[in-house]
Structures are given as C-alpha cells and as structure tokens.
C-alpha cells in the first residue's frame, strides 16, 4: 500500500503553468500538431470539443503569455509553441513570435470551440484538419492523460486496447479508511516523501508574485497591506489566507510561473499546500513532518475528489483541498483519530455549499475562505468541538460524511451545474457580440 500511495502522489502532484483546463486544451493541441507533423501554415482548421466542466473552468481565466482569457487562445498557443513532452508545463519557454501567431490564429477564426454532450468531467477532443486529412487527440479523466491518438485514419493509441496505470476510479486507496492512509504515511521514510517539498517553494513564489499591488483581484495584497497597517493581526489564520489568496491572484490573472498542482488543479495545489506552509513558518515545522503533512493533504484532496469528481458544481478548493489542508494542519498539531474525523466533519459542515462557477480571478476569494476555514476547523476539532452526527450532511464518520457529499454532488448538484454554465454562456455570448444585457434570462442547458 505504501508503494500505491507514493505512485498516486507522483501521478497527482505535478507542476503546472496556467489554469489546468486551458492548459490541458493547449496540451491536446500541441500533441495533435506533433502527431500530424505539419507546420502551422498547413493547418486548415482546428476543432476543440470539451466537456461542460472543462468549458466552464476555462471560460474566464487568464492564459499565460497573453492578455486574453479562455480556451481558444490556449488552443492557439498550444498549436504554435506548445511542447507536449512538458506535460502541464506545455507553454513554458514560448517565444514572442509564437505568441503573436497564436493571437492571429484566434482572430482569424481558425479555431472552433464546442461543448460535448457527455457526463465525463474531464474530456478534451482536438481535431486538426490538414489539406484533406485529419489528426485527432482525446484527453480524458486526467488533464494530462491521452486516451486516443489518430492520424490520417490510423489509430496510434486507444486506451481501451492498452493496459495502463490504474484508473482513479479503481484505486483501492479511495476505499480505505482515512486513519489507515494516515498511519501508512506516518511510516514512510522521509527520503521517499522528500519530493513533496518541491511544491512549497514553487507555490510560495507564486504567492510572493501575488503580494504585489495590482495583481489579479488583489485579495492577497489587501490582507498583506492591512496586516502591515495593523488593521489585521499577523496570525496563523490571516497568514494562511494571505498566502493562499495571493497565489490565486497571480495564477488566475495568467502568471507564467508554475505551481504544484493537486489532483489536476493548480488552485487545489495552492490550497492543499499554502495553509500548511503558513502553519510551518509560524511554528518552525521540520521538513520531515512537513513532507508527511503535505502528503496527507494531497491524498485527502484526491480522496474527496474521487467521490465528487475532478470537476464538479462544488468548489474543489473548499470541499477537497481545504479539507486536506485542515486534516494535515490538525495532524501537525498532534490530532488523534477522533479529532481527524472531526476536522473533516467541521470542514464539510461549513463549506459544502461553495459552488464552482469556473476559474477566474475571483477564485482568490474562495481560496482565502478555504484557508481560513481549514485553520478554524482544525482548531475546533483539537478542542473537541465537532459538528454532531445528523447536523445536515454530517454522518457518524468522516467517510460517511464524504459519501453524503458525493450524493450532494452527483444527485443534487447536476441542475446547479447546468444553471451555472447557462449563466456563464449568456455572459460569453454577450461578450462576443459586445451586447450589454442587464437582465440575464434563464436558459436550460442539457448535458
């Protein structure tokens, strides 16, 4: 089981440049051009077809190397200068000329974007039309997982015929009790978990970028500025909120710096790491304990997202990554089994109603809230103040509460997700046609 934990962490905790949904689209486009083996001039048209959740998360977020937002510019950047061997850092090292060509391709209408009628959360299909023939790429389930490659009618890869890594829905880790996972992590030698520390400096650097005036919404900077003025206290909770929000401010506005992602999300990685970093800085936590705390946080994030989906109507930063951070912080405080159980109940009793309405600069507000609630939930649980069984969705155990969260996400939030997407598409159409509509009418969107 130790080996599976390490394999899962190495698969799910990886660097990413830019919001992972548009970056995954860029990755698919870069791969399509690679297998096609053609120059940009030879490409007649590009069709990008994505799941509703990928569309939602990529609609309003800044894309590195440009002042543009959305999936079309991400696709264009992937075509002109993307390096698919770099995975979710596909846009690293792009040249200015490649960026300019990408903007030109988008302006020319070379790229068409459509939504696929699918229940898949992560689904990206790219079709390059090249002088009478096509190249096709499909990414599914994970943002960097190619499941289908085709060139000129010849299938180069089909995941249905190739045995591979355990799919996330088959991972036995997610069917274990949480206390068992933590007990195994506690026994893993430090040298085998030392790679967890890679995300600390990476995500702190993004936070430092966001602490400059005028970055994103300025949520992190506002905390920092008011702490300097003495309006806010320089305590663990405000430090966690400041760092976490600042990193999101920078990332959502299109910073070219990488962050360490978690379970396919850079913002999840920020939330899973930086509240723990704030605690570690305040209490001088040694690297060995910090690495184990980070492993706990990332695995709790993946554990919960196994039940609610990688992308959903619920904000993964709040309900999954925030819960992971809270469990890890409580563990650093010396929490026992009952207190760990209580942390999860406290978190999900608090933030389970936080919706995901796409990636955007406003996410910094939700990340700040998630960091604050993570500290609060840990402190309450350490003092044995735990939401009682039967309060709302809170069950007798943490695992039962997570199962209730799954029911909320899968059965209760489908119409919510459709309504969110409907509203966002209305805004998008108004933006594209330069029409300002003061009253948004409800549209029915059926997946």
Swiss-Prot record:
GO terms assigned for molecular function: L-cysteine desulfhydrase activity
Organism domain of life: Bacteria
Pfam families for this protein: SDH_alpha
Example of a GO biological process term: L-cysteine catabolic process to pyruvate
Disulfide bonds: none
Family membership noted in the UniProt record: Belongs to the UPF0597 family.
Protein name: UPF0597 protein Amet_4665
Taxonomic source organism: Alkaliphilus metalliredigens (strain QYMF)
